[in-house]
Amino acid sequence: MSQKNETAVLALSLLITLGLAGTGIWWLTSRGGINLGGSSSQNSTVSKSPTGNSPQSDQAIQQRLSAGQKLLISDKATTTKQSAIQAYASGNYNAAISDLQASLKTNPNDPEALIYLNNARIGDRKSYTIAAAVPIGADINAAQEILRGVAQAQNEINQSGGINGTPLKVLIANDDNNPEIASQIASALANNSEILGVIGHFGSDTTLAASKIYQQNQLVAISPTSTSVQLSGIGSNIFRTVPSDRFAANALSRYMLTKLPKQKAAIFFNSASSYSKSLKDEFTTAVYGDGGQIVSEFDFAKGNFNAAESVKSAIAQGAEAIVLAADTATLDKALQVVQVNAQRLPLLAGDSVYTAKTLQVGGAGSTGMVLAVPWHILADPQSNFPQTSKQLWNAEVSWRTALAYDATKALIVGLERNPTRTGIQQALLASDFSATGASGPIRFLPSGDRNRAVQLVIVKPGNRSSYGYDFVPLPGL
């Protein structure tokens, strides 16, 4: 491809990406199909969380927390949902229940509404409370995917009579996937004695920052999405239901070397992301250990990063495959690489690239790309979760929903054994601990990691996504 054509493709990619950025992801809101895919005396409000990296006031942090008295996800909020928030805030739980039920009939794919409905049904009765920390302000689609898993587990346990007769309440926290904000939210949660456990956080950097607070306060946190190897053994109260990057890197390395088969790779990564660096480093180790080679590295974080020039350089240096270790913040740059590459080199990627936007923007250029993800809805036909989740949400769900469901189920089992902070931690580390999740049995290693293989998926033409391309499971290596 000539330099002129590469530049044209890149320009078109940028225009497409910008055009799609404001539209949201169709899967998450409109119709059944693949779904890839935050009582008080305070007045109800549509929470507009402050942004930025400077420390926020206690009041600003409280605006990021809600069990039903604040609207954290205003996107496509129905009028009945907004009135339910007002009713919940004033303690009129019956009105809140009625309005939330009406809202869910209009938008059954709304996890915030389902969580608030279950909380309203509890009202002021005794309950066990956990928090779900999600990146509403930074990645609303990922936030809702995670909340769907939490909401489904809460809904199931409460419909079955609760935890030894006591219902489960969920507090939603919006951390914007910002490490500093996450630390402040972690402090607020740790200082609230009613919070017995936390689901979160989203990105590895955010979880790493918050984990220090949780560990100091002996509050269990289970991340469904943070994969950096830095989290392994970081603290006896820190767990995750998602496999670490080591599992993903090993699977991608084996696929490249034995199935493509190719020996030389170029890696694109974000040096400002713990997750991205972790996946890059683990893949590099795996490839060299298996007899392959990394011929070049390209950093998305560099101010002069150019997708067309980088792909051209990778090919000139002998790369036979491209590995996209992008994080959420650099997904657009990764998709520029996909466009410019134009299927010249095979593509491999981590789980952050598993989004509807990849199919939407990557289009034909993403065909044949292989990704390592923790779970896929079509890969485990024996599980009940794919069917029950589709019935509840009127759409198929992503791995983020499944692993958030698993994290919530693990906390529920911990609460069943001993409904205290220390009791939950001891239960999760017990040799006989086991919970049944969407992705199979849930057990934790002493490091807090989950010992579970990843699933490889490939992009193929299809109609499940409405974009003309789908993620399809690959058989195990």
Per-region residue spans from a language model:
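Extracytosolic ligand-binding ectodomains
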Residues: 2-477
